[in-house]
């Protein structure tokens, strides 16, 4: 239940067991996180919750029991949760983020990435909530990095176009909103396929089989907990300064191809990497990708906002539960 102020607890002593309703001290600052079941959304929800915010997350298929189940394509459902909870901040993480899926399901992707984002922005404006819309470095074509916030976007694929159209829909419906563009993400995944970085781990571990790895596209892997920290810092700055709005960039600062990431992963776990083969040609299958869409983050850095986890440290923290000889640990620790 959104905004509850009481919870049930069990009081047990030998010979007696009572169910007691107790008052709960809920922080005054309220944040709503969409896509809270996803890799980034989980990190954002956790970051706010651990820093004296009353955080409510919403999801759809995987929402229960931890999060509110909300279909973002249902405008009535969106209206009700926002007007019932009255958040000070909304972090909109929900999106179709897989470029190849967007190419194959353009209408469904546009409904979520564009239409739902515009409606969320309108509802946020109605209650005076500060909306942070999570966008992507794929709004740029990758031919002239690094990109500043005011540089003209030119997406190469439909995913980038839907994220750019989502930005426009958000800012048209909510003049006080913020757009946060970010690159490829990794972090504490529930399964390796949840991130385009962590999904490489099995190829790294199975060293008896050669694996082709992209060595063409330049990426800047970014830990979700760093993005979550930036979202919280941005929200807290905004609560003190209403002029904090518009478009912002955040990114890790270690430039790597997927081949270089895979080699770094192997090195972090003292695994061989000689079976990994760098492919320097431009990919011919799937949605077109930008060669180098590096983001200039100086605007946020000037505001004193930012956090960066070194890739070697972050990836080791994220992947150790998935080591083949220690995979049983997932059931205990992950």
From Swiss-Prot:
Heterotrimer; composed of a catalytic MAT2A homodimer that binds one regulatory MAT2B chain. Heterohexamer; composed of a central, catalytic MAT2A homotetramer flanked on either side by a regulatory MAT2B chain. NADP binding increases the affinity for MAT2A. It comes from the Eukaryota. One of its GO terms (cellular component) is cytosol. Disulfide bonds: none annotated. Belongs to the dTDP-4-dehydrorhamnose reductase family. MAT2B subfamily. The modification Phosphothreonine is found at residue 309. NADP(+) binds at residues 37-40, 60-62, 71-72, 93, 97, 159, 185. One of its GO terms (molecular function) is methionine adenosyltransferase regulator activity. Its expression in hepatoma cell lines may lead to increase DNA synthesis and thereby participate in cell proliferation. The gene is MAT2B. It comes from Homo sapiens (Human). Keywords: NADP, One-carbon metabolism, Phosphoprotein. Regulatory subunit of S-adenosylmethionine synthetase 2, an enzyme that catalyzes the formation of S-adenosylmethionine from methionine and ATP. Regulates MAT2A catalytic activity by changing its kinetic properties, increasing its affinity for L-methionine. Can bind NADP (in vitro). InterPro entries: dTDP_dehydrorham_reduct, NAD(P)-bd_dom_sf, RmlD-like-bd. Widely expressed. Residues 319-334 are annotated as: Required for interaction with MAT2A. Pathway: Amino-acid biosynthesis; S-adenosyl-L-methionine biosynthesis; S-adenosyl-L-methionine from L-methionine: step 1/1. Pfam families: RmlD_sub_bind. This is Methionine adenosyltransferase 2 subunit beta. GO terms for biological process: one-carbon metabolic process; S-adenosylmethionine biosynthetic process.
């Amino acid at each position: 239940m959104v905004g509850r102020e009481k919870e049930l607890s069990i009081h047990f002593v030998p010979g007696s067991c009572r169910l007691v309703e107790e008052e709960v001290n809920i922080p005054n600052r309220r944040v709503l996180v969409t896509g809270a079941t996803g890799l980034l959304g989980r990190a954002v929800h956790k970051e706010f919750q651990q820093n004296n915010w009353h955080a409510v997350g919403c999801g759809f298929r995987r929402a229960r029991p931890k999060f509110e189940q909300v279909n973002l394509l249902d405008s009535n459902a969106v209206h009700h949760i926002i007007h019932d909870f009255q958040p000070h901040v909304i972090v909109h993480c929900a999106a179709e983020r897989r470029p190849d899926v967007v190419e194959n399901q353009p209408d469904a992707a546009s409904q979520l990435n564009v239409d739902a984002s515009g409606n969320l922005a309108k509802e946020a404006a109605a209650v005076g909530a500060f909306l942070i819309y999570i966008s992507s470095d794929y709004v740029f074509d990758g031919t002239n990095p690094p990109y500043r916030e005011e540089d003209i976007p030119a997406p190469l694929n439909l995913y980038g176009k839907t994220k750019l159209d989502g930005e426009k829909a958000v800012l048209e419906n909510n003049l006080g909103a913020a757009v946060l563009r970010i690159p490829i993400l990794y972090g504490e995944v529930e399964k390796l396929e949840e991130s385009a970085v962590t999904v490489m781990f099995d190829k790294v571990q199975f060293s008896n089989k050669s694996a082709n790895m992209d060595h063409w596209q330049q990426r800047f892997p970014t830990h979700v907990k760093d993005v979550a920290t930036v979202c919280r810092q941005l929200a807290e700055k905004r609560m003190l300064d209403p002029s904090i709005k518009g478009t912002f960039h955040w990114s890790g600062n270690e430039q790597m191809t997927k081949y270089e990431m895979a080699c770094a992963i192997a090195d972090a776990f003292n695994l061989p990497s000689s079976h990994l083969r760098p492919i320097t040609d431009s990919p011919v299958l799937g949605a077109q990708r930008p060669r180098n869409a590096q983001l200039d983050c100086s605007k946020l850095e000037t505001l004193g906002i930012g956090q960066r986890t070194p890739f070697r440290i972050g990836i080791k923290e994220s992947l150790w539960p998935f080591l083949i000889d220690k995979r049983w640990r997932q059931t205990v620790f992950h």
